Amino acid sequence: MASTTCAREVHYRGVRKRPWGRYAAEIRDPWKKTRVWLGTFDTPEEAALAYDGAARFLRGIKAKTNFPSPLSLDLNHLPSAPSAATAAANNQPHQHQQLWFAAPPPVPPSSDHHHQHHRIFLRTGVLNDKTSDYSSTEAPLYFTSSPNTATSSPGYQVVGFPMMNSSPSPVTVRRGLAIDLNEPPPLWL
């Protein structure tokens, strides 16, 4: 009898594979008792990172995540991202992901000071998609506790969450256009 082995895909917490191959990430908000849509991603790792960021934001250090906390990583042993000139000189595509640690942008003025204190989220970045070094002018995807205080550029969405605790160094993860084929087209198209 021939044994058949099926190559099983790695399954991440909070991530579902869509029939057309993209990966959806969502998390359950325990206070509102609703599911919060985090977006669709090209790879399961990007979706898992989005889930991990939301889980840490909602549940703090006791959150069950797919990957270890970036704050627990030894930052001295992380490889640095090569410059565009170095990548062009090597003519080799990079097949791994790189995390960038950056501070959130300044908070716009608002009359409701309770909701404007914290914005944080992940932005996934794949080195072969990068043409230049990380710039703080690029608009990442943020969580905010009030949609009135959030600003985003086209291609990025803002998701609201209640603030649990502050994070000393937010993790940003770059991703492509935030167009979800499950939703109607955005008004700016």
UniProtKB/Swiss-Prot annotation:
Location(s) in or outside the cell: Nucleus
DNA-binding region: 11-68
Presence of the UniProt keyword NADP in the record: no
UniProt-listed InterPro entries: AP2/ERF_dom, AP2/ERF_dom_sf, DNA-bd_dom_sf
Record key words, sorted: DNA-binding, Ethylene signaling pathway, Nucleus, Plant defense, Repressor, Transcription, Transcription regulation
Transmembrane stretches, start-end: none
Feature: compositional bias, Low complexity: 83-98
Region (Disordered): 83-117
Family, as annotated: Belongs to the AP2/ERF transcription factor family. ERF subfamily.
Protein name: Ethylene-responsive transcription factor 12
Organism for this UniProt entry: Arabidopsis thaliana (Mouse-ear cress)
